[in-house]
């Protein structure tokens, strides 16, 4: 892979509280080294910015935080070359039906800005999409988008992905490329997943 291979490309990464620090660091450094611009996005709930905190899955583990000042409702996914849903429970949080604290309804399942953003990206085959680990949860409100797509995911998400009509492919590599959609089993597979995304962009 050549230096600055993604010069001029733009990457949108949807994330939330409970993000995995080394995953987001990998994107920030990896895409920047290749020349791409990286934008992290989350629900800002009307604020100018929000501080989100990392996942903690063991006693005594250090908690990290990051400030995010971009809301997917203010951006067009068609302005990006790559759109990624970060791992862990970020996708669950991003599915919250606005306004925060509302009871919502079945008719509003697709209204969260991050869901709309990722769905719109899925409708554009020129954009390379990626969902790592639990990331495909962002699309379960849109089964018509997942129907028939070949994917891999963490087994925690498998029932939901199956019920949404996706085709589960338990590939030994832990990475599945289905045309413009790249998925991987878990954050442990970040190296192969990242390479698959870049290679898909480069054609």
In which residue ranges do the predicted regions lie?
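Extended, subdomain-level signal for the structured scaffold at the beginning of enzyme domains
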Residues: 1-124, 137-147, 158-203
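Active-site-adjacent substrate-recognition loops and nearby beta-strands
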Residues: 154
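Short, thiol/selenol-centered motifs that function as redox-active sites or metal-ligating centers
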Residues: 131-135
């Amino acid at each position: 892979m050549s230096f600055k291979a993604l010069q001029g490309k733009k990457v949108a990464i949807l994330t939330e509280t409970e993000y995995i620090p080394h995953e987001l660091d990998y994107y920030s450094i990896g895409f920047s080294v290749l020349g791409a611009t990286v934008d992290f996005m989350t629900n800002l709930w009307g604020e100018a910015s929000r501080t989100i905190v990392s996942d903690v899955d063991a006693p005594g583990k250090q908690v990290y935080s990051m400030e995010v000042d971009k809301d997917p409702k203010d951006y067009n996914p068609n302005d990006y070359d790559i759109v990624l849903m970060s791992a862990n429970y970020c996708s669950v949080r991003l599915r919250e039906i606005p306004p925060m604290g509302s009871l919502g309804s079945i008719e509003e399942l697709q209204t969260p800005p991050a869901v709309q953003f990722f769905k719109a990206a899925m409708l554009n085959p020129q954009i390379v999409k990626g969902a790592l680990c639990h990331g495909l949860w962002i699309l379960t409100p849109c089964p018509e988008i997942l129907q028939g797509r070949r994917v891999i995911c963490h087994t925690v998400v498998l029932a939901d992905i199956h019920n949404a009509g996706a085709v589960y492919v338990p590939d030994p590599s832990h990475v599945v490329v289905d045309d413009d959609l790249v998925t991987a089993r878990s954050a442990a597979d970040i190296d192969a997943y990242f390479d698959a995304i870049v290679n898909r962009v480069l054609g």
